Structures are given as C-alpha cells and as structure tokens.
Amino acid sequence: MACPWQFLFKIKSQKVDLTTELDINNNVRKGHQPPSSPVTQDDPKRHSPGKHGNESPQPLTGTVKTSPDPLGKLDAPPSACPRHVRIKNWGSGVTFQDTLHQKAKGDLSCKSKSCLASIMNPKSLTIGPRDKPTPPDELLPQAIEFVNQYYGSFKEAKIEEHLARVEAVTKEIETTGTYQLTGDELIFATKQAWRNAPRCIGRIQWSNLQVFDARSCSTAQEMFEHICRHVRYATNNGNIRSAITVFPQRSDGKHDFRVWNAQLIRYAGYQMPDGSIRGDPASVEFTQLCIDLGWKPKFSRFDVLPLVLQADGRDPELFEIPPDLVLEVPMEHPRYEWFQELELKWYALPAVANMLLEVGGLEFPGCPFNGWYMGTEVGVRDFCDVQRYNILEEVGRRMGLETHKLASLWKDRAVVEINVAVLHSFQKQNVTIMDHHSAAESFMKYMQNEYRSRGGCPADWIWLVPPISGSITPVFHQEMLNYILSPFYYYQVEAWKTHVWQDERRRPQRREIRFKVLIKAVFFASVLMQKAMSSRVRATILFATETGRSETLAQDLGALFSCAFNPKVLCMDQYQLSHLEEEQLLLVVTSTFGNGDSPGNGEKLKKSLLMLKELTNKFRYAVFGLGSSMYPQFCAFAHDIDQKLSQLGASQLAPTGEGDELSGQEEAFRSWAVQTFKAACEIFDVSGKHHIEIPKLYTSSVTWDPHHYRLVQDSEPLDLNKALSSMHAKPVFTMRLKSQQNLQSPKSSRTTLLVELSCEGSQAPSYLPGEHLGVFPCNQPALVQGILERVVDGPAPHQPVRLETLCENGSYWVKDKRLPPCSLSQALTHFLDITTPPTQLLLRKLAQLATEEAERQRLETLCQPSDYNKWKFTNSPTFLEVLEEFPSLRVSASFLLSQLPILKPRYYSISSSRDLRPTEIHLTVAVLTYRTRDGQGPLHHGVCSTWLSSLKPQDPVPCFVRSASGFQLPEDRSRPCILIGPGTGIAPFRSFWQQRLHEAEHKGLQGGRMTLVFGCRRPEEDHLYWEEMLEMARKGVLHEVHTAYSRLPDQPKVYVQDILRQRLAGEVLRVLHEEQGHLYVCGDVRMARDVAHSLKQLMATALSLDEEQVEDYFFQLKSQKRYHEDIFGAVFPYEMKKDGAAPSDPRAPGANRS
C-alpha cells in the first residue's frame, strides 16, 4: 500500500467557507476537522529507549526542547486566520488567545442548552470495552496524525525519517490491522497525554515523567512484578518520583491487560452488619469484590487492598502488595496533641491505575501512573468528604468549635487544621507533598508557558480550583478552555462490570443483579415512596437551639412522625412565616435562652410571629420546650409560641411539653412525642394507626441490665487534660493557682474570691475581654470516699479499669467511649456528677438494686413527677445522700461508670485583660454554701467554687476559653458604654476597664464614656473592687461609678434598676438613642429582667413609644448588637417559693439553653 499522502499534505486550493455552521461547544465548523498548528513538544530522541522482548522494562526519560515545527509547511492550514478564543484572568487582567483548541479531538458532553461540565465521568471522557479491533480505515488517519505530531516535536526537521515512518506504519496497518509504537513514541505519547490532561493541576512536571515499558509481559504475575518495580521506584523512600508503567495495547477487546483497582494503593472499606462502614467508604464495592475473589479481610480502618490484575483478557488474579513497598504517613498536628488520638494515616503514593491511554488510534487499558499528593486531596477529599472518612465534625468538636452553628464557620476552621496536620505529617516524614496554594501558582506558570509555546492549554476549571481557599488561589480568577487533545488519558468502565468470565465459578455472586436493573429497582421504589409520602399528611417540625440539643430532639421527632406522616425538619431561621397558611400540622421543639428569650436562630420567627394579627388557616400544632427549672422563666419561649398560635386560632394537638434539664428531660420528651404522635394519628385518621411500628428509641427499656456491662483492667495512665478534651470536645489546657483573695470584708458571712491563675507557658491562651473560662472542677473528697465505701463487687479504688459494653447482638464487647480508662476513684473525682439530684430515670434503675422491698417501692414512687419534684426540691440530694437514704442499694462500679451523668464544666466570666496581664487569667468567684430542708438539712457546697477555694498555690486547674462574641467591647472604641453588674456580675467589666487602661497607657487610645452601675448590700461589707473602681475613675477609664446599696440601715433598698431610673435616665437616652452606644448587663436572670423592664419604661416615656413599639426598639438594639446580656445565677425553685432569694453557683451563662 502506498503512503497515504492525503493525510500528510493539505490541498491549498481549498477555500474557507466563512458561513459554515459552527459547533459552539468546540469552536470548530461542524463536520470539519480543524487544521493543525505548530506544536512545541518533547524531543524523544534524547531518551534512552529500551528494547522489546522478555527483559525487564527499562526506564525511559526525556527532556523538553522548544522550536518551531519543521514540517509546518506540510501541515499548513487554509489561507485564513485561525479562529481563537480570548481567555482572561480576572485577577490580573492578562488575556490569552487560544488557538490550540482547533486541534481538539471529538466533542465534549455539553449541549447547546445545557452544560455538563460538572459531571464526574462524562461519556466524552470515557472509553468503554471493545469486542472487535479498530477498523484500519479508522486507525490509519489517527496513526498518521500522531506520527506527524511526534516528528513535529523535533528541533530539527527529519523529513526522510518522518516519511519512512509514515510508510512503515501504513504497511503495518495494512498487513496486521494495527501497529506498534516505538519506545521513543511511547515515551512521547505518555508525556504528551499528561500534558493534555485538563483535570491535572500539576502538569508543570509533565516532561519529567519516568516511563516503564511493560508491553512485553503476558501474565498477571509479570504484571505484578512490573507494578512492584514501579511502586518501589516511585516511592523512593518518600522522595516521590512521577512514573508510568504501560502494559500491552488493546487488540480485539477480548485480550485486555487491566488493573482492576482504582489506585495501586488504596484502603479497604467494609460494610458492617449494623449498616456502618469501617475503612474507606469509597472502596466498599471493590473490597467486597476482593473478598468474593478470595481475599481475607482484616476489618481495620486502614487495610491496603490487594491488586486485582487481568492479563490477556483472562480472569483476574489477586496479589497482596508487600508491606515494605507501602509507605504510610501517620497523621499528627503541630499544635493539637489529641489529633494523634484519631489514629489517622495515609499512603504516600497516589497512583491512578484504572485509566486508559489513547494515542494514535491505539488504546492501552493498563497504564498505572503516579505523581505526588496535593495536600487537599488527603486533607479535604479523603478525610473530610461525607462519603469518605468524614472526620470534619469530630475534629471540630475536639477543637471546641460550635459545630451546631453553620454561621460559626466551624467547618472552615476545622478543615484548615486538618490540612495543616496533613502537610505537617508528610513533611515531618520527609514525604513529598505540595500545598494547594503552591500547586495553583505552579499551574499558572505552566499555563503561561503553554500559551507561549503552543497557543493553548486545555483546562477544566471545576477540577483545577482547589476544594478549599477558592478565590484566594489564582486559578479561581482564570478563565479556562476545556477540550480533548490526543494523546489522552480516558476513564474506563469498571472492569468487573464488563469482564466476560471464563470460569463462572469465580464470578462474584453479588453481581447477579445488573447495575441497570438495580438502578431501575431503586428508582421504582423511590417513586413509590414519593407517592406514598405525598399522600400523607404534611408535618413541619421547627426547632430553635443554642447548643444543638433541640435540633437533635427535632430530628428524633421527625423519625417518629415519618412512620405515618410526611415530615420536614427546619430551623426557625429557615422558615417563611407565610407558610403557616399552608400548614396541616406544625410541631415546635425549642429551648429558652437567657431571660425567657428565644435562641438566636429563633429571633426572626419570634418577631414575625408576635406581629402577626390573623391566620385564616386553622392548622393543628404542638410545642415542646427545653430548659432548666432553676430559671424563673422556665420554657418561657415555648409557652409564648403556644400562646400566640392559640390566639391566632390554631388548634393545640397536645399539651405543651416541658423538658427539664434537671429532671429527666429525655424521658419527658419521649413521653410527649409518643402522646403527640398518637393524637395526630387519631385526629388525621391515619390508616392502620393501631399497628404502626415506631422507632426503637421510643420503645426501648429503661431498666438496668448488669450483664451488658463489664470492667476490664487497663494499664494506660490517665492524662487528665487529654481525657477531658476528648469527652467534652474542648481544647483543654492547664492553668495553675497563683493566689486567692477574699473580696468581701471580714464582717460578711459570704465569700467572693478573686482567683488569679497563671499559665505554664510564656503567655496565657488567647481570649478577649468578656469571654468565659470553662473550669473542670473536682468533686469533694468526702463525697467520693463515701460512695467508694458503698460500692459492692468493685475493683480496688485506684485500680485503672475500662468499661466495656455488649454489642446489640450480644456477640462481642466494645470499649465504652463515654469515659477514658481510669480508676473508680478518678472517675468519681474528675468525670462523674455526684452532686446533682438523680433523675427519675436513674431512680427507676436504682429501684432494681434495692434489696429491701419498702425501699424499692419508695424509689418507684419517687419516679412519679409530683412525688419526685417535692423530694428533689426539699432535699436536693447528692448521690451519696441517696445511698444513705436507701441503705439497701447494692450499687456496682459498672453501674456508677455507666449510669451517673457526666460532670460538666463551670463557666466564669474572665475578670482580666490579656494585654494587661499576658500570663494570667483572673476570675471572680462567689463561693456557694447552703442548707436544704428549709435550713435544717445537711450543708451543701457549690462544686466548682468550693473546689477553687480549697486550692493551694501552684495547684493545677484544667480549663478552656469559651467565646462570648455577643458580650465584647465595641469595635468602635469611641462609642459610649453603660455597664450594669451587681455582685459577681462585675466580673466581665473588670476585664473591660483593664483593657481600656492598657489601651490608654500603652497605645494612647482614649475610649468613649464608660459608665459603671454596680450593686451590693453595704459599702463596708461586699463592695467588690471598690479601690480599683476609684482608681479607674481617677484615671478617666470610668467616666462615672454609681452604686446601689440594698441593705443600708434605716434606708430603703436600692437596686441597679433604681439607679437607672433616678440618676441615669438622660445618660441612657443619650447613649442608646443619640450616640449609638452600647449597654451591657451581667447578673442573674431576675436582675436582668428587672433592668430590661426599667429601661423599656424609661425609653417608652422619653420617646413616646407604646408597648409594641418599645419591644421592637429593644429588639432592634439586640439585632444591632448594642444591647448585651450575660445572664447567670439560676434560681432554685424551692427557694423561690420560700423567699424569692437564691444563691448562684455555678456561674453558668446559658444554663437555660438547649
């Protein structure tokens, strides 16, 4: 056959038809192959090619040369200017003109009316299996085009060699129906395919690819040996080198050489019996295939999968990768020691194994290749994707972030730290990795080079922009043109979905259901479910929360109502009030915040709902409130919603439920939920309502089964900070007591301490004035010892043990994650709450442990709400007092470790400025003592305040800083402020005036007027920080100081709200209304309520506002973050009934939050 000159020369007499219809997706004329243009490419003649045969593959390398195309005249385009696409960088303003796209091969998936650019594996980038060879008339022009491209890469023209090669390829195709690439051509093709890969950000290294020619192998064993050689070379003890191994090309499609693995090294994923996934979820299907083929799984999180290799179209064979070939990097963080507890690791070599190399009409379905990692590939995609290891929320919790609030940006902060850990870990082990910023910069340099050398650069913007950092990377602002050039790496259909099995006995049984059939079945079931759900009564479930507790219960409620209704769970701030006119059933689960207010994400709905005047749709509703009965406005927001909906004409489905944090909140919710669900089924006449199977959550037994728990000896020493960090998801650190000072005079019967803590390092942790310190206290030794003396069948008090629980099916024991391994004495001292009165649920379980029948009956009686509340508020018993009241109780160590509640941290407003005291944190602590039973009962002590008062200098204090973004000094320091804080409410204001003092003396900054309103009993008894206040007033930090004394002899009681009305009415009006200033209130809930009431009266009088207008005025103040409240000091109900007074321990802002 003569040389096909028509593929080598162009007929110059052709004219360009400027009216030809264009393919708008590829910028070429439809039905017309765009003309070639000069290309600057690698010079393969500088490589050292290997020879074919049965020898080991030889490394083939090459370097880049740039020069004009010597055969450009042979491949000259028609006499018309080449069409170009202008590409702009919107960050720098630089533009490129892309002409290379005219050489694009085939069409992309996009259509004239839809863009498919974000499809993961589009058909245009995928090559499926073949059942016959490529016809010679299709193969020949592609082969000649590649040969032209190859010889066009030389610096000097080699026309005779070029023409001879074209002639040889032509004859080979005519004779055999195909042709073979030379070693140099293979090197050129693999590198050029990498250069053309639009989804790769690291192409600047394309010319440094190491090529292993394995086209001579014939068996799976030989393939395995080649791959082992590849992995060893590429890993290089961590100094990763890019490489590719090329197995024999496809012939008739029935004798393919393929690697079935997606990557040469990848972790297994196991579908466990309970539905959970252990390991990498992305590998579940392939892992099961390996098991079906005979692999023995290990069932750990990071098991390296075996290689599944197919040679010459035969059935695949399994090969375990030698462990010494797999370099793995254990993950750690440069600052967070707990990161190692996650026990994460990742393999060092990213080697894609299942793509196909297309070159000159030839297809190589087996061509595993590797580069090195960009940090985000591991830190974002592998670790944080919800369909992968999904560690983001766990890391966020351990960092102490507000993971229940999307607006807190906890995801962004956590994902950055995970990526910091990945980069740090790889670099510490001297393993090659590149951060995404450097990768983006290198791609921009590569792109400039490509436009300069060959007039274009195919690029997929969606894939090249890193998964984090977005617009702060340069690639984000770069317009890109995406097209397919040849040679090219294509995706393939998974091998196990198309393989024709020669031994049917080895075919995995799990593939008996074809994928298409399965999809159709799932789709059909989905349609049926949608129809079923659409025919059900719609139920909207709204929640408002500060800590996430209400959201959790709302989701549980949604699971219950999905058994018979069509529920939708929404946060209140996502709900449109206009939808009330369309509701059939509305359910609300909400906490109450502060002084009877709504949580932050309920404010918008609250305001809109209260302003609503009428409702034409009379739907059904039910409300459940969460809170703490220690607060006088218990569940107030929930009752406000109930009252308003009733006023609007909606019908109450069930009485408003109340979940008391101190009295069986979960049990109360479950009871209310089931009652509401049954009532809804009756009202809406749900079909089969008496036979509905409800979730196990609502039917599970509340009994204690000792056979489900056991204690096992453990030798691991207790790291207290590490344990507390893990349990509470807080970044715990240790401060040490520097000093204590009683701020009250010797005349006072009460104690208020200034606690000064010093840090172990050079500087205290970062905090702002107004923020809180969470302190982890210890229980009193006497209480701990009393309980230890009553434990039966327990280990030695100081013997470290771990609690294990029996799994649901009873087949194995698992470590209980609630507590760390520790001794019983340590658990009772540091981790378990032994002072809060037992809940009704705990009493019910204790009843099972009573050996005296009378005591058992008494405990069961106390489980009833009326008896329980009277007993609880009269005695407020500690757990030791319960054991003393019911001496026949036989309580085991496993019962204590599994059933007692967790000891919570206590929060105190920080009373110092970090700028003024960089190595210290100060607290203002009221030490709580009180007697129960109307003063006749045993003496009780506040847990944390008493513990702090007992410390000696240098004793450790485990703690953490909690943000209080709503209670900080104004960003504009010139704004005037009014500070209102009686008693220990002065605590955060001390940090305010210390900060202002530092700014004035060290930075020369003068703040706006700061007026302080303080309240106490008598000046000579409990005027806290009196001398400091006078000094701050003398230095001009405090503009004025006003004090309200409530216990002066022969004088009427004066409170802070009286000072506001009598002395500061004009100042309040100026600060809040005229000068856009700020007002801060810190103290117990009753004081905050009275202050708010007085302020509203004052402003209503001054501005002539009615009740609704003044409520809206203060709502706007809070929305503008100019009215700040830090409320603490819960009120005990039994004391409220007695005299309306109450002590306040612990300082717990937000104790009435969900």
UniProtKB/Swiss-Prot annotation:
Positions that bind FAD: H772, R906, Y908, S909, T924, A926, Y930, V943, C944, S945
Biased composition annotated in UniProt, kind: Polar residues: 55-66
Annotated Flavodoxin-like domain residues: 539-677
Regulation: Regulated by calcium/calmodulin.
Cellular localization per UniProt: Cytoplasm, Cytosol
Catalytic activity: 2 L-arginine + 3 NADPH + 4 O2 + H(+) = 2 L-citrulline + 2 nitric oxide + 3 NADP(+) + 4 H2O
Residues the entry annotates as binding FMN: T545, E546, T547, R549, S550, S591, T592, S628, C635, E661, Q665
Short motif DINNN-motif, span: 23-27
Any one GO CC term of the record: peroxisome
InterPro entries: CysJ-like_FAD-binding (IPR003097), FAD-bd_FR_type (IPR017927), Flavdoxin-like (IPR001094), Flavodoxin/NO_synth (IPR008254), Flavoprot_Pyr_Nucl_cyt_Rdtase (IPR001709), Flavoprotein-like_sf (IPR029039), FNR_nucleotide-bd (IPR039261), NADPH_Cyt_P450_Rdtase_alpha (IPR023173)
Enzyme class: oxidoreductase
Task performed by this protein: Produces nitric oxide (NO) which is a messenger molecule with diverse functions throughout the body. In macrophages, NO mediates tumoricidal and bactericidal actions. Also has nitrosylase activity and mediates cysteine S-nitrosylation of cytoplasmic target proteins such PTGS2/COX2. As component of the iNOS-S100A8/9 transnitrosylase complex involved in the selective inflammatory stimulus-dependent S-nitrosylation of GAPDH implicated in regulation of the GAIT complex activity and probably multiple targets including ANXA5, EZR, MSN and VIM.
Identification of the protein by name: Nitric oxide synthase, inducible
Species annotation: Capra hircus
